[in-house]
Amino acid sequence: MKKTSRRLKTLKSKVDPKLYSLNEAVTILRATSNAKFKETAEAHISLGLNPKYADQQLRATVILPKGTGKLVKVAVIAKGEKLTEAMNAGADISGSEELIDEISKGRLDFDKLIATPDIMPLIAKLGRVLGPRGLMPSPKAGTVTLDITKSINEFKGGKVEYRVDRTGIIHVPFGKSSFPEEDLVMNLQTIKDSIDKNKPSGSKGKYWKTFFLSSTMGPSIQIDITSLL
């Protein structure tokens, strides 16, 4: 059984076992984030969904108005004019068949992979490499597109993808714990609005079940969902 560090025990003692408002939770998150690096602020949201049913699956993207605080490295696979567009738009890595070959051999030094629709049949063979890492291009994620410039700018500017896992939980970053409180609150509110907007048609009963915040190395803080609805 994994031991809880003395540091985490101390931080947990600062969080009462109660439900907090969104603003209170963000204040505590910032106060309990004291690692020697810039910790990511994370939301962990349990929804009343069973993703084994097609009409209860949820996968979407949202642009955080205050960004993620992370430098996102974008790779693009395209041909001809679209490849040139990618290079001009600031893609960190770009290529065609040769980049597909490099990825198949283990090159994964990027955070997002964007591709044009015409090249997707060639990328299909990379499913085993990209799939488990959440890097496989997808229309739903906005990573299969002809608008290469827009997609690159959005991901570098704060666009994040979220989806429910097998247990109906969403794990999504919403900035760095060092962000001003009002910026974190704004990003969280944007995520909440997006989840409501993209509510699956098959959702039954209570949609929002639990909502926790934490920093990378910090304790969990539970939000009072009724204060958001």
Curated annotation (Swiss-Prot):
One of its GO terms (cellular component) is large ribosomal subunit. It is found in: Plastid, Chloroplast. InterPro entries: Ribosom_uL1_bac-type (IPR005878), Ribosomal_uL1 (IPR002143), Ribosomal_uL1-like (IPR023674), Ribosomal_uL1/biogenesis (IPR028364), Ribosomal_uL1_3-a/b-sand (IPR016095), Ribosomal_uL1_CS (IPR023673). Its main location: plastid. SUPFAM superfamilies: Ribosomal protein L1 (SSF56808). Belongs to the universal ribosomal protein uL1 family. NCBIfam families: rplA_bact (TIGR01169). PANTHER family: 54S RIBOSOMAL PROTEIN L1, MITOCHONDRIAL, LARGE RIBOSOMAL SUBUNIT PROTEIN UL1M. This is Large ribosomal subunit protein uL1c. It comes from Porphyra purpurea (Red seaweed). The gene is rpl1.
